[in-house]
C-alpha cells in the first residue's frame, strides 16, 4: 500500500510516496540523514501531487531504445530524449520528468541494504530532480556564517577539495555552520539563499588529526569509516557556535588542494565564478526542464557574492590559519 508523507525542506513542502513496506523504511532511513523533516500524511493545503515515488516490489520498466546516453556518478548511465531522463544503476531505474508521472519515480531492483551506496545514489538523483522542479537547486559546497556579520561563506568544490576540513576548522573557531558538503540554493525576496541538505559532517582521519577541537570532543574510528574513508558525525552537539538553517551568501571560495605547503588565494570575476558554478552543477545543462531556472540562480549567486579561488596547501591544516584566511576573504568581500 502506498504511503504518502509530507516532508519540509528549505522552507517548502514535498509530497513523497513509498509504495511498499521496504520503500517506506528506505525513504525514512535516508531522509533522516538529511534536513527533510517528516510532517505526516497530507492535510488540507498540502501538495496533492507526489513529487517523488519509490518502490521495490514492482517490475523495473524498460528504457526506450535509441536514446542518447552519458555516464553519471555512481557507476550509472543516464538516457534522455531532452524531456525525460532515465538513470540506470545496477538494474534499478530513476525516471525523471515523464508526462503523467511524478516528477521523479524510482524502481528498485528488489530491496537493497539500507546502507547501500546504490540506494543512496538512486534516491539522491530522484530527490534532486524533484527539488529542481520546485526551484531548489543543489550545490556541492560547505556553508558557514561569519560570526560577526552573519553573512554566508560558501566553500565550493568536489569531493576531496578540502570543504569538510575548512568547515571543521571554521566551526571550531566559532563560525555558525550549515553544512560541510551539500546545500540547496533558492531565491527569496530578490536574494539567493543557501539551505543545508545533509545533517552530518564527513571527515577523514587527516582532518581529525589536524583538529584538536574534534579530538577533545569526539573520536575517529577507522572501522566506522565508509568506502571513501570518511566517518560521519553529527556536528550539532560538537560545535558551540551552533547551527543556522539558512544564510545569504556574501562570499564564494572555490576550493582545491595545491599539494604544496603554502596556500594561494586570488579574486575571481563574476563571469569566472559563473563558469565554475556551472561546472559544479551539471544538471543545470542536462535537465532541460529546469535549466533556465537553474542557470538563473547560479548567475544571481555569482553576481551577489564576491568570489575567490583557493589552492589550499598544508598550511590550512592549521585551524587558526584556515579561520584567518576565510575571515580575510569575507572582510574583503564587504569592502
Spell out what each predicted region is.
Residues 1-159, 172-173, 183-335:
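A noncatalytic interaction/capping subdomain that flanks phosphate/NTP-handling catalytic cores
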Residues 166-167:
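Post-Walker A alpha-helix
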Residues 176:
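Residue-level detector of anion-binding/catalytic polar loops
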Residues 163:
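Conserved lysine of the Walker
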Residues 180:
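Active-site flanking residues adjacent to catalytic metal/cofactor-binding acidic residues
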Amino acid at each position: 500500500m502506498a504511503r504518502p508523507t509530507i516532508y519540509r525542506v528549505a522552507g517548502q513542502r514535498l509530497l513523497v510516496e513509498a509504495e511498499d513496506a521496504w520503500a517506506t523504511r528506505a525513504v525514512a532511513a535516508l531522509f533522516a540523514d538529511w534536513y527533510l523533516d517528516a510532517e505526516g500524511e497530507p492535510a488540507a493545503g498540502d501538495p496533492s501531487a507526489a513529487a517523488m515515488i519509490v518502490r521495490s516490489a514492482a517490475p523495473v520498466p524498460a528504457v526506450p531504445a535509441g536514446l542518447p546516453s552519458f555516464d553519471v556518478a555512481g557507476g550509472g548511465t543516464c538516457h534522455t530524449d531532452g524531456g525525460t531522463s532515465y538513470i540506470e544503476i545496477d538494474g534499478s531505474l530513476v525516471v525523471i520528468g515523464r508526462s503523467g508521472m511524478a516528477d521523479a519515480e524510482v524502481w528498485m531492483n528488489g530491496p537493497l541494504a539500507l546502507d547501500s551506496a546504490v540506494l543512496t545514489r538512486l534516491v539522491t538523483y530522484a530527490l534532486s530532480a524533484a527539488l529542481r522542479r520546485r526551484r531548489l537547486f543543489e550545490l556541492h559546497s560547505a556553508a558557514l556564517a561569519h560570526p560577526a556579520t552573519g553573512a554566508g561563506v560558501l566553500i565550493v568544490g568536489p569531493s576531496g577539495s578540502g570543504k569538510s576540513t575548512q568547515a571543521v576548522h571554521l566551526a571550531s573557531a566559532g563560525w555558525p555552520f550549515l553544512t560541510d558538503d551539500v546545500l540547496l540554493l533558492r531565491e527569496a525576496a530578490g536574494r539567493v539563499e543557501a539551505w543545508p541538505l545533509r545533517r552530518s559532517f564527513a571527515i577523514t582521519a587527516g582532518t581529525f588529526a589536524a583538529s584538536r577541537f574534534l579530538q577533545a570532543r569526539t573520536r575517529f574510528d577507522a572501522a566506522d569509516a565508509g568506502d571513501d574513508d570518511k566517518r560521519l558525525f553529527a556536528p550539532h552537539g560538537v560545535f558551540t557556535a551552533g547551527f543556522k538553517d539558512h544564510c545569504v551568501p556574501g562570499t564564494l571560495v572555490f576550493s582545491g588542494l595545491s599539494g604544496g605547503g603554502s596556500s594561494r588565494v586570488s579574486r575571481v570575476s563574476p563571469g569566472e565564478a559563473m563558469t565554475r558554478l556551472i561546472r559544479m552543477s551539471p544538471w543545470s545543462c542536462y535537465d532541460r526542464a529546469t535549466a533556465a531556472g537553474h542557470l538563473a540562480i547560479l548567475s544571481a549567486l555569482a553576481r551577489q557574492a564576491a568570489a575567490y579561488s583557493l589552492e589550499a596547501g598544508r598550511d590550512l591544516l592549521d585551524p587558526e590559519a584556515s579561520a584567518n584566511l576565510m575571515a580575510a576573504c569575507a572582510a574583503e568581500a564587504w569592502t
